[in-house]
Amino acid sequence: MTPSAKRRTLNTHYFMPPHVRVVELMTSGNTAPEIMSLLVDRMKTVGLKPFVAKRESTGFIQNRVWASIKREMLHVVAEGIVDAQTADDIFVETIVRPGTRPFAAMDYVGLDTVANIERTYAQERHLDTTYTVDYLQREFIDVGKLGIKSNKGGFYPPSTAADAVSTKPRIFVLDNGLSGQIDNLKQGKILEYSFEGEYIRTVFKDQYLPDGIAVSQEENVLFWTCMGSPGQKDGMIYAGKLDGNDIRPLIQQGIVHTPKQIVIDEANKKLYFTDREGLCIWRCDKDGSNLEQVVVTGDNNNECDRRDATRWCVGITFSHTLGKIFWTQKGASKGWQGRIFSANMTIPPGETAAHRKDKVCLLEGLAEPIDLDFHESTKTLYWTDRGEMPFGNTLNRLRFDDRGYALHTDSTPHLKHEIIARKFHEAIGLKIDARNEHVYVADLGGSICRCKLDGSDKVRLVFQEDRAWTGVALA
C-alpha cells in the first residue's frame, strides 16, 4: 500500500442489529487526522453515532469491554454460582434497563470504595492491579478525586458526576396495530424504548386495539386497556410485569365497552379508566375488584346516546392537590365539539355517578381533546388534541389556582388555555415526567416526542411510519 493510501485507510466497526446506529472508528497507525474528522461528520449527517478510539486496540472499544463482561459471566456460571438465565436477568435489570454508566456509577459509589473492592477481588483471584487499583490510586485517590463526594469530582467533573447517574425514564408505548397490513384487529403491541428513543424490546403483543397504558412504579406492573371492537361490549383491562411476564386480565369481556385512557391512583390503590361507548368513567382496585362508575354521561343502552360523540369519555386524570378528576368528552372527529370536565374524586353524598352537581365544564368548543395528565406542583392540566388546525394536533395546558378554579389565559387568541406545542400527527398519548420536567406525546402518525413543560425544546425521539401510537407511559 502506498504512503498516500495508508493515510486514507482506517478501521471501522459497525454494530448489529441495524437499529443500533453506533460505529467505531480507529486509526490504522497512519490515518490522516482530517480523514477521521471527515468521516465523523459524514456519519453524523446520516444518523450514525460515531465513536473514535484514541489509539489502536484489538476489539476497538466496545468489544474490549464486552470481552471482560463475557469472561466474568462465564466464570459465575462455570463456577456454579448461578445459571445463565439468572445471570442474564440480573445484568439486564441492574445495568441495561436503568441505563447504568459504569464510570458514572463508580463516581457515585466513590473511587476509594471502588479501589477497595477491586483490591479484594485482586487478592482473592490473584489479579494484576496495574490498570485497576494502582491506576485509581495514582490518578484519582492520591490527588483527592473521589467522585461526587469530593469537590474535585472523579471521572466526571463535580457538577456533572451526580447528573450522569440520574435515572432517565424508560418509555412504554402502545401500537394499536392499525398502521400496517390489517389481517385482524388483534395485532397491537406494547413496546419499550430508551430515554434517547432507541428501541429496546416488544413487551407484549397480539393485543386487541390497545389504547391506554399506565405504570405502577411501586409494583413494576403495567396496566393497559384494550378497546375491543368499537361499539361492542368486549373491551378489557390487563396487567403484566414490566419484564414481559405474568400477563393477566383484570376486567374480562362483557363488562365494559371501549376502555380508553387509564391512570393509577397509587395513594388509594385505585385505577381510573374511561369507557367511550360505555359513556362513563370507571374506578376499581388494582386487581380489578370493586369496579364502580364515578361519572356517567348517558344511557349506553340508548342507541342515540351511544352514537352521540359529545358524550364519549376519552381522557382521564386526577389531582390529589385539588381533589379533582378531569376528563375529556371529545365530540365528533375534527368536530370542534370537544369539552373538558372536572368533578370531585368522591361522589357527593346522596348523588350518583349519573347525577352529580359537582360536575363542571372547564372548556368547550375544542377541536378534539384526547388524553390528559396533571402536573401537581404547578397545578396545571395538560392534554393532547388530535383535531384540525389551527388548534388541533397540539399539546395544551390550563392552570388552576389553589382553590381549584381555572386560570384562563389569552396567550393564544380566541382560546382560554395555552397551546404550547404544535404539528403532531393525530396526537393521542400523553405523559408528564415531573422529575425531569418533560412532557411526552405519542401520535398515530408514528412519532413519540418530548418537550419541556412549557412546550419548548420539542424533539422527536421515535418515528416509525408503520406504527400507530396511542398511550404512552414511563418507568
Swiss-Prot record:
Residues binding NAD(+), per UniProt: G99, T100, R101, P102, F103, A104, N245
Enzyme class: oxidoreductase
Inactivation phenotype: Significantly reduces the production of T-toxin and decreases the virulence to maize.
Pfam families associated with the record: 3HCDH
One biological process term in Gene Ontology: fatty acid metabolic process
Binding-site positions, CoA: K149
Pathway(s) per entry: Mycotoxin biosynthesis
Molecular function, one GO term: oxidoreductase activity, acting on the CH-OH group of donors, NAD or NADP as acceptor
Ranges annotated as spanning the membrane: none
UniProt keyword list: NAD, Oxidoreductase
EC number: 1.1.-.-
SMART domains linked: LY
Family membership: Belongs to the 3-hydroxyacyl-CoA dehydrogenase family.
Job description of the protein: 3-hydroxyacyl-CoA dehydrogenase-like protein; part of the Tox1A locus, one of the 2 loci that mediate the biosynthesis of T-toxin, a family of linear polyketides 37 to 45 carbons in length, of which the major component is 41 carbons, and which leads to high virulence to maize. One of the PKSs (PKS1 or PKS2) could synthesize a precursor, used subsequently by the other PKS as starter unit, to add additional carbons.
Name used for this protein in its record: 3-hydroxyacyl-CoA dehydrogenase-like protein LAM1
Record organism: Cochliobolus heterostrophus (strain C4 / ATCC 48331 / race T) (Southern corn leaf blight fungus)
Lineage: Eukaryota, Fungi, Dikarya, Ascomycota, Pezizomycotina
Name of the gene: LAM1
